[in-house]
């Protein structure tokens, strides 16, 4: 079997799919994208195609190493996201050829189900509470919400009070009936993260995500030393070599590699194993589409240290398409009591509606993340 063609489709809301075709008619799908930089990743995918056309798709490990090492310059969000989507599609092909789901090819299940959590938006505490109540109605009891809005390097007590007030009202409204993580989104400087974490500790969040940017990872162990709240990070780390450094430094309780940013299934399985060796939990980052989610689920079901799975159903970014709009076998992604079950169809287990993909790719928006500014006019972290 040989790879004959690679096609990319930029899609709403902010996704990109790729299709790898073979000379035997077997097709694999992947989801390579950096949100807001889809065209750049698309260019990288087609550059990698030069290494792939005419090659045997079954040699996933070798093709991964070729894409990673054949260029003198490597790594980073663009290149690793391009590799990630290609890698997903290669695993999809292998599973279809062998008539087995990817988790079966990786040694089989370590669990029967995995807890899903849902992002909750809202500018006011009442909006967040209303969103949680609606999601509880369809079975969710675990959530993630923004821990704060933009925050100055050294900010005032009003900004701290606003963040704490939202969390306090949520805990008061639901008590211990729900769990929620707080995503700082890298918006907070290390000095302000110390203040916020201390003030939030009485409300027992499930985790604090990206309390500081990945570029400031040296602060993770320092922040972890001052709190009992688990610290989570990893969505902006792109290879096992970056994760190696933070695992060795300590401080993180939960790793959140993104299966569409960190080299795909091949690389993230290695990252999961590294995390287990350090007694660190795994919770793959996934605010993206159905192929990315499927890839995450296969890793969850073969990694003992996986604890829960993010998914984007109803997320505020989803303008123009929802999580399963491009999927024919929607029933396979249904949740029972807030848990996903293993996907059982061969390959990734996603039956893509190719006609719909082609149609909506004709008018895909160029999504950009917001540009925020502080009151003094300086650029703020989004």
UniProtKB/Swiss-Prot annotation:
Coiled coil: none annotated. Binds 1 Mg(2+) ion per subunit. Its cofactor is Mg(2+). Gene3D superfamilies: Enolase-like C-terminal domain, Enolase-like, N-terminal domain. InterPro entries: DgoD-like (IPR034593), Enolase-like_C_sf (IPR036849), Enolase-like_N (IPR029017), Enolase_C-like (IPR029065), Galactonate_deHydtase (IPR023592), Mandel_Rmase/mucon_lact_enz_CS (IPR018110), Mandelate_racemase_C (IPR013342), Mandelate_racemase_N_dom (IPR013341). Keywords: Lyase, Magnesium, Metal-binding. The record marks 258 as: Increases basicity of active site His. Reaction proceeds via an anti dehydration. Catalyzes the dehydration of D-galactonate to 2-keto-3-deoxy-D-galactonate. This is D-galactonate dehydratase. The lineage of its organism: Bacteria, Pseudomonadati, Pseudomonadota, Gammaproteobacteria, Enterobacterales. The gene is dgoD.
């Amino acid at each position: 079997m040989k790879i004959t063609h690679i096609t990319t489709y930029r899609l709403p809301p902010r996704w990109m799919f790729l299709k790898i075709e073979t000379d035997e008619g077997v097709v694999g799908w992947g989801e390579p994208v950096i949100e807001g930089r889809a065209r750049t990743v698309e260019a990288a995918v087609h550059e990698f195609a030069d290494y792939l056309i005419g090659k045997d798709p079954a040699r996933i490990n070798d093709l991964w190493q070729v894409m990673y090492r054949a260029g003198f310059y490597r790594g980073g969000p663009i290149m690793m996201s391009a590799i990630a989507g290609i890698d997903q599609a290669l695993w999809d092909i292998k599973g279809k050829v062998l008539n087995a789901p990817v988790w079966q090819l990786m040694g089989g299940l370590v669990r029967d189900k995995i807890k899903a959590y849902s992002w909750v938006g809202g500018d006011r505490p009442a909006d967040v509470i209303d969103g949680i109540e609606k999601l509880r109605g369809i079975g969710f009891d675990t959530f993630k919400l923004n821990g704060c809005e933009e925050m100055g390097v050294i900010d005032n007590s009003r900004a701290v009070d606003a963040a704490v007030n939202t969390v306090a009202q949520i805990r008061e409204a639901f008590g211990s009936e729900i769990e929620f993580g707080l995503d700082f989104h890298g918006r907070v400087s290390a000095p302000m993260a110390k203040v916020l974490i201390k003030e939030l500790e009485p409300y027992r969040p499930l985790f604090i995500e990206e309390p500081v940017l990945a570029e400031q990872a040296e602060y993770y162990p320092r922040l972890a030393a001052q709190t009992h709240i688990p610290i989570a990070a990893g969505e902006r780390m792109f290879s096992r070599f970056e994760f190696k450094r933070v695992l060795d430094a300590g401080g993180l309780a939960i790793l959140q590699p993104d299966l569409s940013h960190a080299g795909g299934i091949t690389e993230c399985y290695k990252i999961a194993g590294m995390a287990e060796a350090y007694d660190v939990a795994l919770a793959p980052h996934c605010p993206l589409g159905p192929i990315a989610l499927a890839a995450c689920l296969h890793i969850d079901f073969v990694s003992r240290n996986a604890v829960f799975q993010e998914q984007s159903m109803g997320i505020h970014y989803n303008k123009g398409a929802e999580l399963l709009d491009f999927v024919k076998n929607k029933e396979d992604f249904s949740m029972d009591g807030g848990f996903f079950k293993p996907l059982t169809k061969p390959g990734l287990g996603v039956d893509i509606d190719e006609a719909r993909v082609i149609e909506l790719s004709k008018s895909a928006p160029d999504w950009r993340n917001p540009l925020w500014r502080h009151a003094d006019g300086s650029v703020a972290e989004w």
